[in-house]
Amino acid sequence: MSTYLIGDVHGCYDELIALLKQVDFTPGQDTLWLTGDLVARGPGSLDVLRFVKSLGDSVRLVLGNHDLHLLAVFAGISRNKPKDRITPLLEAHDVDELINWLRRQPLLQIDEEKKLVMAHAGITPQWDLQTAKECARDVEAVLASDSYPFFLDAMYGDMPNNWSPELSGVARLRFVTNAFTRMRYCFPNGQLDMYCKDTPENAPSPLKPWFAIPGPVTNEYSVVFGHWASLEGKGTPENIYALDTGCCWGGDMTCLRWEDKAYFIQPSNRQLDLGEGEAAAS
């Protein structure tokens, strides 16, 4: 039994299947972890959702910002942008079933035995693991409820950007969503910066990548995340694994086999344009 962790799929169904064949992934024996952003940009979002859903207990995933945006488009809150290439999904006969499955997926995955944590954008250094669990449950409960469209309508925005246990209501849910699905940079005190999307060497002072600021979770656990394609999987501490390597922008789809830390790469079927990716991603 092996554990395979794969970065953002973004509708790149053919590359996902090729990568799983490359590692001889066997559902029922192996477990697949996915860093979120299953949909948008690539041509096969519908096939990706159908396939991942079919894996049942053999897959563990987290929601990304593009997955949440899909839910908002489905609910009539956000506009369907042609560049996301999700129209075939929205028009599919089983779209209701797929959406209801997707909105019941978590924001956080934890394996205590492996001391492994996964979230789409990472874990803010302002949280310990118990706080992260509680915050994830808050958003997950709303997404799984009948009132999820009201949350999706209120989730867009960059404030508040500083964690406090006193946060409540929409402000709390928005901070949690941004921390789990959109975060890249923090100020030295852990406060989120939601504007900078440059690579770390070009980021203005005093901003630092979230993983460069010591926090309770990263001090005790390994953390796997996606979201940040321009990192190209590089520049993180030894126990932090950046797995989004920009497949939908012409980069690669990356898989990490946890047991021996072996990497496997599947080249994209698209022409390389990582600059396009970071400019377009939220």
Swiss-Prot record:
GO terms for molecular function: bis(5'-nucleosyl)-tetraphosphatase (symmetrical) activity. Disulfide bonds: none annotated. It comes from the Bacteria. SUPFAM superfamilies: Metallo-dependent phosphatases. Its EC number is 3.6.1.41. InterPro entries: ApaH, Calcineurin-like_PHP_ApaH, Metallo-depent_PP-like. Pfam families: Metallophos. HAMAP family: ApaH. Belongs to the Ap4A hydrolase family. Hydrolyzes diadenosine 5',5'''-P1,P4-tetraphosphate to yield ADP. This is Bis(5'-nucleosyl)-tetraphosphatase, symmetrical. It comes from Enterobacter sp. (strain 638). The gene is apaH.
